[in-house]
Amino acid sequence: MKRFRIRSVDFRQLVNFFSFMRWECSSSATVWVRFNMTIRIINRQSRFCCKSFLSARLYSSSEQVRDVADVAKNISKVLMSSPQLVLDSALDQSGLRVSQEVVEDVLNRFRNAGLLTYRFFQWSEKQRHYEHSVRAYHMMIESTAKIRQYKLMWDLINAMRKKKMLNVETFCIVMRKYARAQKVDEAIYAFNVMEKYDLPPNLVAFNGLLSALCKSKNVRKAQEVFENMRDRFTPDSKTYSILLEGWGKEPNLPKAREVFREMIDAGCHPDIVTYSIMVDILCKAGRVDEALGIVRSMDPSICKPTTFIYSVLVHTYGTENRLEEAVDTFLEMERSGMKADVAVFNSLIGAFCKANRMKNVYRVLKEMKSKGVTPNSKSCNIILRHLIERGEKDEAFDVFRKMIKVCEPDADTYTMVIKMFCEKKEMETADKVWKYMRKKGVFPSMHTFSVLINGLCEERTTQKACVLLEEMIEMGIRPSGVTFGRLRQLLIKEEREDVLKFLNEKMNVLVNEPLCD
């Protein structure tokens, strides 16, 4: 066993470790933060080393086949438990082999952790018999753009260009991410530069640009682009539907109606997507009866209402406290021969929650089970949010414990439960939920970290809060100004300015690091 431990840490890591400890010991108040991290590094290296021998034995048999989800989950655990200093060696020693499906799964799980995601992306690229798929590149482009690493994003695009992997969707993603960051000019530039990448813009790209602008609440700019470029492309029903949805979100119902009429005049027949958007717009404008009239006027032989349309109607009736109409609409859908999906059931659950009819909520869950419809994280979140808002926290936790047996909670689910226990001053239980979430391989969001750090600050558990903040930064997640400011005030009050300086330096690295070696 000792032989494996010696091999688990290479010479460069040992040099870094000892020089690192020598520097840190000059500041006694900082030691408790860094010492904790250093011990974790050594322990994890030993553990991963022992596992690697067993993993190698398992993989020596051609009969051993691992499920993609299981491998992705195991890689996720390595990523979440390993500091950046030893991340590559931890992945190497895990013995886990990657495939395109596995990499895509992991990238999806860590889509909100740009730094960590990119480290894994780099590591996987070096593995034998593996090449990144177009989808993996697209997911990485999204992750880097999300943390405003645009230079790296274009480096990825150029790498795809060399491999002849670029397509229109690549630039649609770039336009969408720029627009979401309110970089409208850059989004339009991405559209115009396609020609230089041997991809002449087509109607799909044009629609992609309009969609990016509309979804980022820049519908007026989208309308302007449409007017200026409509002669270059022949608008189709999707083009008009995009603008229709954009004006609906503005919200500007008269302009949405105008676009709808223009669509008809241009000879573009509304499809089910157009009708769905129009129903959604009217419902959000408080005109659910008019929306229902549109549904009634649809010719079932040409355009049959979808479960999405019914879910919107049920949801709207619920928010307007028209529970009877919500139930009637649900039953009408079933009578039409259409089977309710999880989205429709969730709308019905929301309607019953709004009316505080919890017995009916639990009956709906039973009906879902009898009809083979599995609740999802949103089902759980709707119920939890309602119970927590009403102060029924014990019942909320009971629902949480039951729901995790039938569905996969997301980060929002865990965040609500952790926040609930922090507010109840039950930090031990909050910590248990946090550890359970990590064990299940669910990647914490910025909000998940924030609620726990804020809870620890409230209890004046400064050391744990600092370690958690450091872990958050290590994962490439930037803390909110409120969370960092709260911990900062606490450290100043406790006269731990050196620890604050250390955390500030870590933050600066996260903000300024270009992510590429």
UniProtKB/Swiss-Prot annotation:
Which InterPro entries does the UniProt record give? Pentatricopeptide_rpt, TPR-like_helical_dom_sf
| PROSITE patterns recorded | PPR
Q: Per the record's keyword annotation, is DNA-binding included, yes or no?
A: no
Please tell me whether the keyword Repeat is annotated for this protein.
yes
- List keywords of the entry alphabetically: Mitochondrion, Repeat, Transit peptide
Please name the SUPFAM superfamilies in this protein's record: TPR-like
The transit peptide is at 1-59
Intracellular or extracellular location(s) = Mitochondrion
Repeat positions for PPR: 133-163, 167-201, 202-232, 236-270, 271-305, 306-340, 341-375, 376-406, 410-444, 445-479
Q: Name one Pfam family in it.
A: PPR_2
Per the record, its GO cellular-component terms are: mitochondrion
Q: Which NCBIfam families match?
A: PPR
In the record, the note on similarity to other proteins reads: Belongs to the PPR family. P subfamily.
- What is the recorded name of this protein? Pentatricopeptide repeat-containing protein At1g77360, mitochondrial
Species of origin reads Arabidopsis thaliana
Top-level taxonomy: Eukaryota, Viridiplantae, Streptophyta, Embryophyta, Tracheophyta
